[in-house]
Amino acid sequence: MNYDFSRELRLLTPEDYKFVFKQAHRAGSPHFTILARENSLSHPRLGLAVPKKQIKTAVGRNKFKRIVRESFRNKQHSLPAKDFVVIAKKSAQELSNEDFNKLLDKLWHRLSRPSRG
């Protein structure tokens, strides 16, 4: 199995993001929200939204993105064929890396279950 985070595993265009925002299933926490929507591909894709307004420093924004990408990269083979967008909130920078990863795992699992609607 390949665990890289190649270009095909990313949401690249504004249209990709709009597609997810239009009719997304949400899984949230006080620290970040993950939106998910089925895609027509055979693999999941990830997009990140980390506003300067929420996480002020570039170091904080980069850390958030690095942790989310790493978690996605390791979970990609167990995730369904959906497009995911992770949106940061202010309190995300207060989490330790360990707590951050536990919370991400919980939300990935929640969004991996078949939807009821």
Curated annotation (Swiss-Prot):
GO terms for molecular function: 3'-tRNA processing endoribonuclease activity; ribonuclease P activity; tRNA binding. It holds the Pfam family Ribonuclease_P. PROSITE patterns: RIBONUCLEASE_P. It is an enzyme of class 3 (hydrolase). One of its GO terms (cellular component) is ribonuclease P complex. NCBIfam families: rnpA. This is Ribonuclease P protein component. The gene is rnpA.
